[in-house]
Structure formats: structure tokens, C-alpha cells
Regions:
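Polytopic transmembrane helical bundles with strong interfacial aromatic enrichment
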Residues: 1-525
Length: 525
């Protein structure tokens, strides 16, 4: 068993799983903070119910994200010790800031938010949530700074073959990091917004199905209520309609932000990692046309066997250079340039193990980069289109009484997740065979790079990594079941599941009051 390949599979599986939690935590957290802000400002119970319901789902996802994220730290030492030695001096600063500053604020103030209902003044309680959410946003920035340094090394000098940081500000303001961060944050907001849209659509459809809400001859909604179902009153309708329309509007805006930042990031990658982008386009030869569809053995070594079926003239040049005429270098031009710059064979060094002296294949796996790039764009476009459609269909105050359309909305929650995952896989797989990518122009440090083959721990066998992969897979599988059960349970239960007091309000609880002391623990886990 090849330790390198198994270690890569382990890192990919665990990181993709963790990355499912991250964008939802970022996007949903920001939206919940806005909801509570509206409640504090207006006192309207609709905003309180929204805060409690969506806050419950936010907490479930946050806790699972923390549990799955812990493994990422240990993997560097267990399976990637050589990589850790190489990048340790650089990674120390951003990861220390992430752990000691950002994550500290997240966990501490989120705890205050959970247990602070009806114990802290409203504005102080709101401030605890905003602090936790900002902590998450800052935490993501430091992680992306570390990852972006691997994509574009800056702020270091080589000392005895290892990069030593000499400018922390250059690392923190790496242009790759700033663009990637804005792109990631916009994608996270889109995920949170689609989450609101799909679940709210389900509850509005339930109200239509149960006959609580009807539609008059003009197509306008007639809002009803059911006294026998806790929480199914007129305010409940406003909760779901407001959540849906906020989700749809924010999703449209967020996807516009994703497209704008993605365009900037793409142009930067054409400068810094041209072979990644050439592989993403299956561009074997220099040219200006963008391949909408190519066929052939994308995973093979002979790029000339790839045939472009549908092409948009000039679009590739526009994506790379903002004009329609400048030729973009293809794979057949770039691979010889890489071979000349970084060698044709891996060095004869013990760090490479059995791979020492092997020929280097500089071409990323085109079937992954090509389709990953298109899945990222395709999922995003589908989700944005449905969000715009949702705004139109709900303009009269409810959703159509259509089960297929409801399931489409619920399934649409997965589209932004798919776009985020496809984008991450494309980004990471596209830099192979490097784990730290050499790109001295226009602002990188020449000579700072590391082949993936040199990054794996030399003292770990394939069998040991298989065992850890199986163990982590089992643990992650259990966590997936737990999260799915909790999410589905509270989604089906609606607002009443997050606010048990709706089922037994008495004189102590007016219609606009917050939860009483006895209800606080029902909100905690």
C-alpha cells in the first residue's frame, strides 16, 4: 500500500467532510445575528422565533464542525510530518492567531449566547452572538491565509532549504489569500441563504398542505392558524415567509459576489498557476476559446487526444486577461516550461522514498480539474437561478402547493454545498504534483516549493494510514448520522421544537416576551 496515496485520500475525505460544516457555520451565523439584531431593535416576536429556530440549527452545525475540525490539526503531524517541518515556521503565526484569538472568541462568546437568554441584557446578549460570529469569520481568514501561502508563497526567505518567515504582513495580505477569502465568504453566505430558503419553503408548503394557509381568487395568501398544533399561528407564517425571502434575496446577492470574486481569482490563477487553469479548461494548445464541453481521456497523459466539442471563441482569453484576443498558454506549452524550471525527475533524496528519481508528471488530473471547475460553476448557477425564481413565486405571500417544487427547493439546499466542495477539490487537486506551489511571478518568492511526494511522513506505513482512515471514517460516519438526525428532527419540529414555551404559554409569557428561565436549557445542548 502506497502511504502517499492513502494519506492523500484520508486528508481529502476528512477535509471535504469538515468543509461541509464550515460554510454553513459562517453563512448561517451571520444571518442569525442579523435576525437577533432585528428582534432587539423592533421587539417583534417574528424575529425572536427566527433567531431561536435558525440558531438551534446553527449550534448543531457549529458543534459538529468543531468535532470534525480537530482532526485536521493532528493529520499534519501523523501523516504529513515532512510537510509540517517545511511549512511550520510560516504556518505557526496564522494558525496560532486562529486558535488563540479567533476560536477563543467563537467558543467563549457562543457559550455566553447559549446560556445568556433572559440572564443577560438584550444588547449584551446580542453582542455575544456578534462576537462569536465575527470570531468565526476571522478564524476562516487565518485558515485561508495558511492555505493561500501554499498556493502562492510570500513573505519568506530560504534558509537551509526551508522557508523562514521574514514578513508576517506579507503573509497576511497575500493577494491570493485576500481574493480567496472574499470568494469563500461569499460562497458561505450563499450556503446559509439557500439553507433558509429550502427549509422555509418546506414549512410554508406544509401549511398549504394542512389547509392552514389558502389562496384566494386573486392568488393572494389567506393566512390561517391551527390551535391544535403548537406554533402554527399567523406569526408562524410570517417567520417562514420572511426567512424564505431573506434567503432568496441574500442568495442572489451572494452568488453575484461569488461570480465577481471568482472572476478576479481566476485571473490571478492564470498568472500564478497557469497549468492548473489550462487543465481546468482542457486547453492542450495555446488559444483564446473556452471549452464548454470536451471529450476524450482527460485523465490520460496524451493531451492531444482531448477533443473540444463546444467552444466559445475569445471567452478563455477574457477570463484570463480581460480581452478577447490574447492567447492563453495551453498544456503542451506549459509542461515543458515546468520541466525546464523544476526538473524532469524527482531528486534522488531519501525523503522521496521509493519515488526518488521518478519522472515528474506536472499535468494535474484533468478529469478532476475540468469537471470540478464546471460543477462548481454549474451548481452555483442552478442555485442562483432557483433563488431568483423563489423570489418571484413567493411575491404574493406563500409558495405553490406543489410537492415536486417543494422537494426541488429542499434538494436545492445541496447545490451551494456541491459548488463549495467542487471548488475546493479543484483548487487542491489542480496544484499537483506540488503541495507548496512555485509561482515567483508576479509577487511570489522564487525557489519556495515542495513536491507532494516529499510531504508524507516517512515513518508511517500504508497499513497504519489505512487503519487511521478506517477509524476516522467510522467516527465521521457516526457524526454524520448524529447531525442528520438532529437537523431533521428540529427542522420537522419547526419553531415549536426550538421554543417549547409556545406549547405552554401562561400569564408569565406574553406574546412578545422572550423565554423564561426554565426554558433556557431547552435551547442548549
Amino acid at each position: 500500500m502506497d502511504p502517499l496515496e492513502i494519506a492523500r485520500w484520508q486528508f481529502g475525505i476528512t477535509t471535504v467532510y469538515h468543509f461541509v460544516m464550515v460554510p454553513l457555520t459562517l453563512g448561517l451565523g451571520l444571518l442569525v445575528a442579523v435576525m437577533q439584531t432585528m428582534w432587539v431593535r423592533t421587539g417583534n416576536e417574528r424575529w425572536l422565533r427566527m433567531t431561536k429556530f435558525w440558531g438551534k440549527l446553527y449550534l448543531i452545525n457549529f458543534i459538529m464542525g468543531v468535532a470534525t475540525g480537530l482532526v485536521q490539526e493532528f493529520q499534519f503531524g501523523m501523516a504529513w510530518s515532512e510537510y509540517s517541518r517545511f511549512v511550520g515556521d510560516v504556518f505557526g503565526a496564522p494558525l496560532a492567531m486562529e486558535g488563540l484569538l479567533a476560536f477563543f472568541f467563537e467558543s467563549t462568546f457562543l457559550g455566553l449566547w447559549i446560556f445568556g437568554w433572559d440572564r443577560l441584557p438584550k444588547k449584551v446578549h446580542l453582542a455575544t452572538l456578534w462576537t462569536a460570529v465575527v470570531g468565526s469569520v476571522v478564524s476562516a481568514f487565518f485558515i485561508i491565509v495558511a492555505n493561500s501561502w501554499m498556493q502562492h508563497p510570500v513573505g519568506v526567505e530560504l534558509v537551509d532549504g526551508r522557508p523562514v518567515m521574514n514578513d508576517v504582513w506579507a503573509v497576511l495580505t497575500n493577494n491570493t489569500a485576500l481574493v480567496a477569502y472574499s470568494h469563500t465568504l461569499a460562497g458561505a453566505v450563499a450556503v446559509g441563504a439557500a439553507f433558509l430558503l429550502g427549509i422555509s419553503w418546506y414549512h410554508l408548503w406544509q401549511r398549504r398542505r394542512d389547509g392552514i394557509d389558502t389562496v384566494d381568487d386573486r392568488g393572494a395568501v389567506v393566512v390561517g392558524e391551527r390551535a391544535d398544533i403548537p406554533g402554527r399561528d399567523r406569526t408562524d407564517h410570517r417567520v417562514w415567509l420572511t426567512s424564505l425571502r431573506i434567503g432568496a434575496a441574500v442568495a442572489v446577492a451572494a452568488f453575484a459576489g461569488v461570480a465577481a470574486t471568482g472572476d478576479v481569482q481566476g485571473k490571478l490563477m492564470f498568472e500564478q498557476q497557469p497549468l492548473k487553469m489550462a487543465a481546468a479548461e482542457a486547453a492542450c494548445h495555446d488559444g483564446t476559446g473556452f471549452s464548454v464541453l470536451s471529450v476524450g481521456p482527460l485523465g490520460g497523459q496524451d493531451c492531444d487526444e482531448v477533443v473540444t466539442v463546444i467552444e466559445i471563441p475569445g471567452l478563455l482569453s477574457f477570463l484570463a486577461h480581460n480581452d478577447f484576443d490574447t492567447e492563453v498558454k495551453g498544456v503542451n506549452t506549459l509542461v515543458p516550461e515546468y520541466r525546464e524550471a523544476y526538473g524532469t525527475h524527482l531528486p534522488d533524496d531519501p525523503i522521496y522514498g521509493e519515488r526518488a528519481g521518478q519522472e515528474i508528471d506536472y499535468l494535474p488530473l484533468m478529469e478532476v480539474t475540468y469537471w470540478g471547475f464546471r460543477l462548481m460553476i454549474g451548481f452555483g448557477m442552478l442555485a442562483a437561478a432557483f433563488a431568483a425564481l423563489a423570489l418571484w413565486l413567493t411575491r404574493k405571500g406563500t409558495v405553490p402547493d406543489s410537492r415536486p417544487l417543494m422537494w426541488t427547493a429542499v434538494a436545492g439546499i445541496l447545490a451551494p454545498f456541491g459548488a463549495n466542495i467542487a471548488g475546493w477539490v479543484f483548487t487542491e487537486m489542480g496544484r499537483q504534483p506540488f503541495v507548496v506551489v512555485p509561482n515567483p511571478n508576479p509577487s511570489g518568492v522564487d525557489g519556495v516549493y515542495m513536491f507532494t511526494a516529499a510531504a508524507v511522513s516517512p515513518g508511517v506505513s500504508g497499513q497504519e494510514i489505512v487503519f487511521s482512515l478506517a477509524t476516522l471514517g467510522l467516527i465521521y460516519g457516526v457524526l454524520l448520522v448524529v447531525e442528520t438526525v438532529l437537523i431533521v428532527r428540529y427542522v420537522r419540529g419547526g419553531v415549536a421544537a426550538a421554543m417549547p414555551e409556545l406549547a405552554h404559554r401562561d400569564e408569565e409569557h406574553g406574546p412578545t416576551d422572550g423565554p423564561g428561565r426554565d426554558d433556557v436549557l431547552a435551547f442548549a445542548y
